[in-house]
Amino acid sequence: MRKFTLLMLLLIVISMSGIAGAAEVKNLNTSKTFTKIQEAIDDPSTTDGNIIIVGPGNYTENILVNKSLTLKSNGSAIINAVSSEKSTITIKANNVWIEGFIIIGGKNGIYMENVTGCTITNNTIQNAFVSGWEYYGGNGICLVNSTNNTITNNIIRNNTWNGINVCESKGNIIKNNTIMYSGGIGIYVWGFNKFEGNNIIENNRIINATYGGIYLFRPSNNKICRNYIANVSSGGGGMSGAICIDVSDYNIVKDNIGINCDGGLFTDGMIGNEITNNIFKNCKVAVSESTYGPASRNNKIYGNYFINYETAISDPKGELVDNIWNTTEGGNYWSNYTGNNTGDGTGNIPYYYDNKPLVVDLAIEDIAAKPSGIEVRVKNLGKADIKKIDPLTKLKIKISCDNDVYETFIDPLSAGESQIVRWDKIVPEGNHTIKAEIPYSAEGYLIGTNIRDADISNNVFSKIVQGFVQNKTFTITLTNLGKSTITIKYYISIYTNPVNGTKVSYRELTITLKPNETKTIELGKYPFKYAVSGTMIVKNPSRYRIPLNLRIKYEIEGLNPQMREISKYIAPRGEFRYIARYTGKEEGYADVW
């Protein structure tokens, strides 16, 4: 009985394990289900255009897709190659769609040969392995003689050789992929002979590759745009860079970023390429030309930013001279360049082959005293964009006036961009000298940065300005100190000065104050030397005399107020009339008379 019970428990456990680990593959068009992906593909009723949904689970198989199918998973289907001699997925049909898988191992993660119109999207592809060098092995994705395919939004990592290997394939779109830890190259486009590529490679992130970020070997007319490449080493061979163009012609290489690589731009025998608006930062060698192949010539290389390099240009044979390094507007930015601004935003002496190096030239353009404070206009007169050099840097600005000093920081400025620095110091009436400066080191570097200012003569600017008569708030506050309610008629005029000024305002007010009640009359904002003239009338309508106990406070914003108190009786059916004027004094108080 005990043995029978144990046997039943074992069968239940095995049954439950099978249910928990079961994976379902379903053809949505035929409604058939399978336990293997290859079974679903090979089924005779599976035809071109069918959609196969692969449920969560582990699938240990090498898959051959030889029909125009869509294979989709929600990101939880893991395909492990059963044989490392074959690719995990091999595509031999056109118009195949692969989406949402975790693809592990195999000779390649995905291998595509002689196909067109396929889409590989939203997959994680990792650990493709070969033990030695192979043309078509050890890659996350490998395309051979394939056209017009789309590879997007994949994570490709830890492969023996290349993240994406594109051999003699044309018109493909490779974008928005993240490629990490490639033993070879991040994206390698190559051929045994020169060929028309017309591939688009854009918005990819390539991190930690051994022999190059994006490497073009013999294809032409490709677009390499807006890619981010970091941490590319040379693998000991010396022929490496964030972007490598090797015997490859008429490509557009634009708006890419290469950071922390052994090389920024590697060239060899390239012709007619446009290499513009790229940023190469913290690379040991900014630009290097191979010593093995033919000379690179007739390439446009300008508008690029080469920042914090050890060697600007490595060109032992002088083969990079026959290229276009600048237009009439300017060339490239070189962080180690020490020339000065010629007045047009470029350097006054060439830098290697670049005759018009882009420079930074911060200048104090103007100083103004405004009613709200001091304004200083700072402008980058250079043609180098500081936002590209260091988007996180802060530029120090120092302003002084009347022994007061104000220091602040502004964000980086693009070429030709201005920024207003505001200091809320109110400049009083009269002449005052305001000095503004952009601090720099003895070598001409902007303080707190690694950015050299190419013209320090305009970093300091002094100007004598006329201060403003500041408008102040005038108020009168009335407090009834007596025990009876009183009514006050108040006639108030405001003049431009207390002697013979022009009347600028007139008001008639009726104010009722209960015992111990306080009310404030706000007269408006005027220069503190304006004068307020007020006539106050309090009437007694009764047959008896009444006491009047009133406190009056005269105030001008920022000055010491003055108080007056009235304590007297008003005759029966009589009235009390009180006339007073007040103005502001330079000494800082309100004067009442």
Swiss-Prot record:
Pfam families membership: NosD (PF05048)
Post-translational modifications reported in the UniProt record: N-glycosylated; contains glycans composed of methyl-Man, Man and GalNAc residues in a molar ratio of 2:3:1.
Keyword set, alphabetical order: Cell wall, Cell wall biogenesis/degradation, Glycoprotein, S-layer, Secreted, Signal
One CC-aspect GO term: S-layer
Gene3D superfamilies linked: Single-stranded right-handed beta-helix, Pectin lyase-like (2.160.20.10)
Glycosylated residues in this chain: 29, 58, 66, 74, 114, 122, 145, 148, 158, 176, 208, 231, 326, 336, 340, 431, 471, 500, 516
Main location: secreted
InterPro entries documented for this protein: Carb-bd_sugar_hydrolysis-dom, NosD_dom, Para_beta_helix_rpt-2, PbH1, Pectin_lyas_fold, Pectin_lyase_fold/virulence
Function: The S-layer is a paracrystalline mono-layered assembly of proteins which coat the surface of the cell.
Name used for this protein in its record: Cell surface glycoprotein
Organism name: Methanothermus fervidus (strain ATCC 43054 / DSM 2088 / JCM 10308 / V24 S)
